[in-house]
């Protein structure tokens, strides 16, 4: 309906220009229509007259009067009023409001979907946690946000590709391999010393024992061999770690070292996949950083930057002139030891996405990566790519509270709350809904006690209970032989004249607009907020209006209304990855 109102306004402006009521050379703006904030002022409002007043050299209210006179007739519009400095307020007919009920039931699971995206190809990369440990609650928010955003974009007609970038190359993988091997040696009875900067979690011990069970003592070396020639850890912890990695690689040999590294990677990545699957998050592809190396994609990207004239050599390293494109300084692509940097791999990965034909790249990153955005944008500009094609969404970490107390989290020490633990405690649905209730860039306090409560204060429970309650209504009426006997097209929806019914009708008609708005703004929290509003309206209606009445026509109309409400609740919850239960 919002599009219909915008179309009427566009037709009116065109007619005015043709009639000489607007300058012939005036460029008509894209018509903006919004839901009226106060239902007393109508259903939709447009500020078109105020936007055009200055370029048209007319008073806003006079221009609004002319626009109103030029609006085509519409069976959906009951009236148009001019308010304030020149707002055009549109009021829908009762029939137009009721039509959303019929459309929702006619379209079912498709209700709310549109073609606003016009098949635009969107690549969305999210989570992409290093495969060096289990997913924690911070990753969980990125997973819930990214997956919900992808679903909302799909519902709005975009062609979406979900991808997880696996950082399976570089120093952190060597540290992982060394950490696992040391725990493996412990499992074999060797009294080795574990570095403070190694990966400390129990998951390393678990996977090391699995390696020992699989390969026996094949990779065992003595503690004396390992410690020979290593520097003191206290003097330079990071240098000690690098020396330990080099010593591990030397003692094992390349084949055995690769076996240990691959075992660790596959075990942890397997855990990550399992956690995401259980969280309802699925990808089209897990993209390996190693693939960029093996297929020469990093060298290809560096050659492209060099050909464009934006690289130089200094201090034995290869640099990118990022500062030319607005970054605060130039960035190293290849170190003086010949190894490429993480940034070089990121440039190659983004170029690869572009060369795969995606129109827009959406990156869901932790808020701590905000400083990384300008350098990636700079690289794209240098490669001749419009930086506007990159849309980085920053996600703040969630802070967990239990009993009013903040829970600590530290990945370095191995003491952190994993996504699996959160899911086991509050359930997938509560976790996913809580994660997307607010804008992704806002700090979030996650109250575990609230997420587990069965009360109106728990937003996911409140929304799911609304759906289950409607299902219960139909079960009870079926048992009494009072089930709805008419189709949506036959229902006497004109009987729905109570204020609570008008509110529900208005909300049901808004749903497609909410999906479109959430997609265009890249804000799935809009859907969560809408569902809370719809659930609250239904519960109020349920408590105020009886369904078991003798008036069959009114009863069937009310049942048709709540059935449409159930459908919209199910559709919206589905986009957020939350189940819509039949009973609770």
Curated annotation (Swiss-Prot):
Record-linked SUPFAM superfamilies: Anticodon-binding domain of a subclass of class I aminoacyl-tRNA synthetases, Arginyl-tRNA synthetase (ArgRS), N-terminal 'additional' domain, Nucleotidylyl transferase
PROSITE patterns: AA_TRNA_LIGASE_I (PS00178)
One GO cellular component term noted in the UniProt record for this chain: cytoplasm
CDD domains recorded: ArgRS_core
Location of the motif 'HIGH' region: 129-139
Record's subcellular location: Cytoplasm
Pfam families per UniProt: Arg_tRNA_synt_N (PF03485), DALR_1 (PF05746), tRNA-synt_1d (PF00750)
Database matches in InterPro entries: aa-tRNA-synth_I_CS, Arg-tRNA-ligase, Arg-tRNA-synth_N, Arg-tRNA-synth_N_sf, ArgRS_core, DALR_anticod-bd, Rossmann-like_a/b/a_fold, tRNAsynth_Ia_anticodon-bd
EC number: 6.1.1.19
Top class in the EC scheme: ligase
Subunit structure: Monomer.
UniProt similarity note: Belongs to the class-I aminoacyl-tRNA synthetase family.
Protein name: Arginine--tRNA ligase
């Amino acid at each position: 309906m919002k599009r219909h109102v915008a179309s009427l306004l566009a037709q009116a402006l065109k007619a005015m220009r043709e009639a000489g009521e607007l300058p012939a050379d005036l460029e008509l703006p894209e018509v903006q229509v919004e839901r009226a904030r106060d239902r007393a002022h109508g259903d939709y409002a447009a500020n078109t007259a105020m936007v055009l007043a200055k370029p048209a050299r007319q008073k806003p209210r006079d221009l609004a009067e002319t626009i109103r006179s030029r609006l085509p007739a519409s069976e959906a519009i009951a009236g148009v009023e001019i308010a304030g400095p020149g707002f055009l307020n549109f009021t829908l007919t009762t029939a137009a409001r009721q039509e959303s009920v019929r459309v929702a039931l006619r379209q079912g699971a498709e209700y709310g979907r549109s073609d606003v995206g016009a098949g635009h190809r969107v690549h969305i990369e999210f989570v992409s946690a290093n495969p060096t440990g289990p997913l924690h609650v911070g990753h969980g928010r990125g997973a819930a946000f990214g997956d919900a955003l992808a679903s909302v974009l799909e519902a709005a007609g975009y062609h979406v590709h979900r991808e997880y970038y696996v950082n399976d190359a570089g120093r952190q993988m060597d540290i992982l391999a060394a950490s696992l091997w040391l725990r493996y040696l412990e499992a074999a009875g060797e009294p080795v010393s574990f570095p403070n900067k190694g990966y400390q979690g129990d998951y390393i011990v678990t996977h090391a024992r699995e390696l020992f069970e699989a390969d026996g003592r094949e990779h065992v070396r003595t503690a004396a061999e390992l410690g020979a020639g290593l520097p003191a850890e206290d003097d330079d912890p990071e240098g000690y770690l690098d020396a330990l990695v080099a010593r591990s690689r030397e003692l094992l040999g390349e084949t055995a070292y690769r076996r240990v590294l691959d075992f660790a990677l596959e075990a942890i990545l397997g855990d990550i996949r399992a956690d995401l699957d259980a969280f309802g998050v699925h990808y089209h592809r897990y993209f390996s950083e190693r693939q960029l190396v093996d297929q020469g994609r990093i060298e290809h990207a560096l050659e492209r930057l060099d050909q464009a004239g934006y690289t130089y050599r200094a201090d034995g390293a290869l640099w990118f002139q990022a500062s030319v494109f607005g970054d605060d300084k130039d960035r190293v692509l290849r170190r003086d030891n010949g190894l490429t940097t993480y940034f070089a791999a990121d440039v190659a990965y983004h170029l690869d996405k572009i060369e795969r034909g995606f129109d827009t790249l959406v990156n869901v990153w932790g808020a701590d990566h905000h400083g990384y955005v300008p350098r990636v944008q700079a690289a794209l500009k240098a490669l001749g790519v419009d930086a506007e094609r990159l849309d980085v969404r920053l996600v703040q970490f969630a802070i967990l509270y239990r009993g009013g107390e903040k829970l600590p989290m530290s990945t370095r020490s191995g003491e952190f709350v994993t996504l699996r633990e959160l899911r086991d405690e509050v359930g997938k649905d509560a976790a996913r809904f809580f994660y997307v209730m607010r804008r992704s860039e806002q700090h979030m306090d996650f109250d575990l006690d609230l997420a587990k409560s069965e009360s109106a204060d728990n937003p996911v429970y409140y929304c799911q209970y609304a759906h289950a309650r409607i299902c219960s209504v139909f079960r009870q009426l079926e048992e009494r032989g009072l089930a709805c006997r008419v189709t949506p097209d036959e229902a006497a929806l004109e009987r729905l004249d109570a204020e609570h019914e008008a509110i529900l009708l208005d909300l049901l008609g808004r749903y497609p607009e909410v999906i479109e708005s959430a997609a265009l703004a890249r804000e799935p929290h809009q859907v969560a907020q809408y569902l809370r509003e719809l659930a609250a309206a239904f519960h109020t209606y349920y408590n105020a209006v009886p369904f078991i009445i003798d008036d069959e026509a009114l009863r069937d109309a009310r049942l048709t209304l709540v059935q449409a409400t159930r459908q919209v609740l199910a559709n919206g919850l589905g986009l957020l990855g939350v189940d819509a239960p039949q009973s609770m």
